[in-house]
Design a protein with these regions (language model features):
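Flexible, polar/low-complexity N-terminal or interdomain linker segments that lie immediately upstream
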Residues: 1-31
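Conserved beta-strand scaffold positions in the cores of enzyme catalytic domains, especially
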Residues: 3, 20, 37-39, 85-87
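Short, flexible helix/strand-to-coil boundary loops that buttress conserved ligand/catalytic motifs
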Residues: 33, 49, 89
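Short, structured coil segments at secondary-structure junctions
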Residues: 33-35, 81
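Helix-loop module immediately N-terminal to the HCX5R catalytic loop
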Residues: 36-61
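Catalytic cysteine-centered active loop of the rhodanese-like fold, especially the PTP/DSP P-loop
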Residues: 52-94
Length: 94
């Protein structure tokens, strides 16, 4: 698993074409999220991501509040064949 810190995520976002996916529920996303993130609840990753991200080499960063749901989302994305997936370890509350 490619775990990164919040600060490392910010650097990647500044320097590379990156998709930032918040995997919290919609209600949690409305309470707290990173700017320019896309909300795709973890339960919807398998159904939605292949239509959203066609390039399997696209850099994708996943996160949630505590870093639990994002681990599941990371695993799903890897199983779907995405190669450049990163997880913000501990979530945005870390």
């Amino acid at each position: 698993m490619k775990n990164i810190s919040y600060n490392q995520a910010i650097e990647i976002l500044r320097n590379y074409n990156t998709i930032l996916i918040d995997v919290q529920t919609e209600s949690d996303y409305e309470k707290k999220h990173m700017i320019n993130s896309i909300n795709v609840p973890v339960e919807e990753i398998n159904r939605k991501i292949t239509n959203m991200v066609k390039d399997k080499n696209q850099i994708i960063i996943v996160y949630c509040l505590k870093g639990i749901r994002s681990v599941a989302a990371y695993d799903m994305l890897k199983r779907l064949g995405y190669n450049n997936v990163y997880n913000i370890q501990g979530g945005i509350d870390s």
